[in-house]
């Protein structure tokens, strides 16, 4: 009986996997931050008529295209001098809090990357490299077109978000380096 209970206890503890649970919690938090960033960009665009990485609504003056860019406090607008996060935070439109900027720019944070191809009607994507197995699997499934994800949208940053084997659905194991992207 004691051996059986010991075996069950080991099985339950193995199934819980505290490291995986911590990584999943961090990935969930990072995904929430990505959602907040996308929402702030959308609100800024709705208010100003151009993206925060632009200096004006005129595409001949300021290109709306945003290459795959790491989101950091020193991220500067295209052709300008202002910090994009500064324009979104209390120093600008107040779409995000200064504490949000400090958190996503901190050392040890799983940094966000943002992308928009600049075409009318295209989505803005906020991406990160997941740490938990479940988020890594989801990122790989999306990149390789498996499961319920289907085909990637035409404006999705495939080259940057799905490097190496991330688009290969024949692999026996999840590759590292696939980005989890929203929306």
Model-derived segments and their meaning:
Residues 58-111:
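Acidic, glycine-rich loop-and-strand cores that form catalytic or ligand-binding grooves
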Residues 25, 37-41, 96-97, 123-128:
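Extended, hydrophobic alpha-helical segments
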Residues 7, 25, 55-58, 114:
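Charge-biased, low-complexity intrinsically disordered regions
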Residues 14, 39-58, 94, 98-107:
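Alpha-helix exit/C-cap motif
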Residues 1-18:
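N-terminal single-pass transmembrane signal-anchor helix
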Residues 119-183:
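Short, surface-exposed interaction loops/tails
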Residues 110-120:
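Proteolytic processing hotspots in large secreted/extracellular or virion-associated proteins
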Residues 23-34:
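Membrane-proximal amphipathic alpha-helices
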